[in-house]
C-alpha cells in the first residue's frame, strides 16, 4: 500500500505543477498578443507629431510590435495623403 501512495502523491504534485506552468504560458501569450501597455499612448504621441506637418486621419496609422529574433521591432504604417502644401504654408497663406 505504501508504494501506491508514494506514486499517487507524486502524480498529483506533477499535475499541479503542469497546470501552474500552463497558466504561466497562457498569461505570457496574452501579454504578447495585446502588446505593451504603453502602445496606445505611443500611437497617440506619434499621431500628434505627424499632424504638426500633415493632415492625417487616426485610422490611417497602424502600429504594431513584432519580434525578430531577440529584438522587439516597432512597425509603423502610415497612409499619407496626396502631395499637398504643408500645414504651415497653408496657414500662412490664409492669413494674408
From Swiss-Prot:
Q: Which GO terms describe its biological process?
A: cell division; regulation of division septum assembly
For this protein, the record's SUPFAM superfamilies field holds: Cell division protein MinE topological specificity domain
InterPro entries assigned to the protein according to its UniProt record, in alphabetical order: MinE (IPR005527), MinE_sf (IPR036707)
Q: Which Pfam families match?
A: MinE
Q: Does the keyword NADP apply?
A: no
Q: Does the keyword Cell division apply?
A: yes
* Annotated keywords: Cell cycle, Cell division
Q: What does this protein do?
A: Prevents the cell division inhibition by proteins MinC and MinD at internal division sites while permitting inhibition at polar sites. This ensures cell division at the proper site by restricting the formation of a division septum at the midpoint of the long axis of the cell.
- NCBIfam families from the UniProt entry: minE (TIGR01215), PRK00296.1 (NF001422)
Q: Which family does it belong to?
A: Belongs to the MinE family.
The molecule here is called Cell division topological specificity factor
* Top-level taxonomy: Bacteria, Pseudomonadati, Pseudomonadota, Gammaproteobacteria, Chromatiales
Q: Could you tell me the gene encoding this protein?
A: minE
